[in-house]
Swiss-Prot record:
GO terms for molecular function: alpha-1,2-mannosyltransferase activity. It comes from the Eukaryota. It is a single-pass type II membrane protein. Enzyme activity is regulated by iron. The gene is MNN2. This is Alpha-1,2-mannosyltransferase MNN2.
Amino acid sequence: MIAKQKIKILIGVIIVIATYHFIVSSNVRSKDLSDLVDLGSSDKSTTENERPKNNIVTNNRLDNPPNEDIPHAEPDSPPQEPPKSGNKPDFSIFFEGLEKFAIKQPGIKDKYTSEKAKEKFSTDDNFLFGKEYLENVLDIPQATFKELKDSHKRYVDEHIPKMLQRVKTFGSLAPSDKEWESYKGSSGYIIVGGGRFTWLSFLVIKQLRATGAKLPVEMFIATESDYEKEFCEKVLPKYNARCNVFDYKLADDLKKRFDIGGYQYKMLALLSSKFENVLYLDSDNFPTRNVDYLFESDLYKENNLLLWPDAWARTTNPKYYEIAGVPVKENKLRYSKYDEKQAGGKDKLKPLSEYTFKDSWYHDFEGTLPDPTSETGMFMVNKSSHLKTLLLCLYYNVFGPQYYYPLLTQGSAGEGDKETFIAAAHVMKEPWYQCARQFKWTGYVSKVDNKFTSKALAHYDPVQAQDTTRQDVDIIFMHLSYPKFYPNWLADNHDLVYADTDEHIRMYSSINKNVGYDFDLRVMQFFTEGLCPNYYDSKTGKPIENIPHIDYTNDYMGNHLMYVKDEEQNNIDRCNKVFIPHLKWLKETAEIPTVVS
């Protein structure tokens, strides 16, 4: 009897304890519960009631439950970084590990055995740019040569194949991204801005739209200090253009790691562009016609890399081809003007097979890049089809200033990035096409010394220029390299008005018949309305001339760009004395009707 009572009491105690435990358990804080759940969670979610009953917590870690996978990371380890959002492009992959290919030997820029390579036109017939001459311009130590060759080979043979497994275009998008569908086949223009270059680029965009071009434009902005919110968000959208603002942190990182800047921004603009097909323009390169059609031309679609020629003879060091692993054979492919002169005329030229490296221009032989050099103030490229080319081009530009720029040009005219595109395509055996017609020096005969003064380079339509017998080839670009349209440059150097006589100058009149309008007048109109606050009536905000569709608030760039605003007082004086009178004179003397708005 007593035993039965003890059993009943024991059962009662157990029930009380169980009830108390249940009440306490039901009041456990939700945070504590969630912590426990998180600690034991695997890829397959499990509720508290579904957990095996024998799970126990020790030292803040959940022992591995039966029939449940071990988590990939320890619960107390740092959380993994989430995937990059499609809205935040990550371009750092293109620069990962590039230090492995850095050349440790001192740079070879300006390291000449006696003097830099001679600056001669590609049509020069007096100087022999032979192999012996070209390989003795730069002083390249053997240790530097070996390191360059090793770095180049490893980058091409090891790094590029690995990159091709990771990326499908020269940019941040992948075929699995939702934006890929709109990216594939897209086309547009890119131009580099920032500070005074934003001002020049804006003039180019105005001119581009005046030609009737419709495709979108990106203005690349590399640094935070160069971003101008008002201009980027209110002005450019009116022209179907936008600011392409590069990742500031990455830009700073690249500056510290590789001293990226200047010419190299061109590669960053390409890399970060939202267009697959790109027509790049320098900020002083003005289209004269609507060039949208080039993207649809068979010439572009067949090659996917279009270039335009410079005037200069190629001065690439023969050791570059050894470094790049490109064999050059003593098999002459073409004649030069030098050959013609040495022979005493075209009809006296000996067979190509009889020429050697000693008696002919080196870059007329098999395996070399042909004359003339390239002018990359404009070029077109497909970032997917020519991914290998652009990857190598990136390498050439990252290590360009101290090594590859000198190798490719040896201090001759225009040393910089301009030969890196054609060289990279040549090495990677991807197609390219360079316009068959060289540019036209554009300017006028100065009344000061009665000599021709060159002011711009007029480049031709590469499609029309395929017919080398055709004379009436359209001029489609005007590279206004000297002078550039900076107000102080134009005024102080008397580029628009003779200093002694106050007589006005029309710098580009020789192209007007070709393009069908007064090019000086068109560009000067855009320049004046953007630069001169006194071009507008102070009361109405309308221009002092009867020009529709423009006003002070929207079209005077002092309201939007610090470069213009900071010089406002000086510009008012320049506008009164030079720019407004010059614009008026251009209109009064125009021989071809010209739409200026």
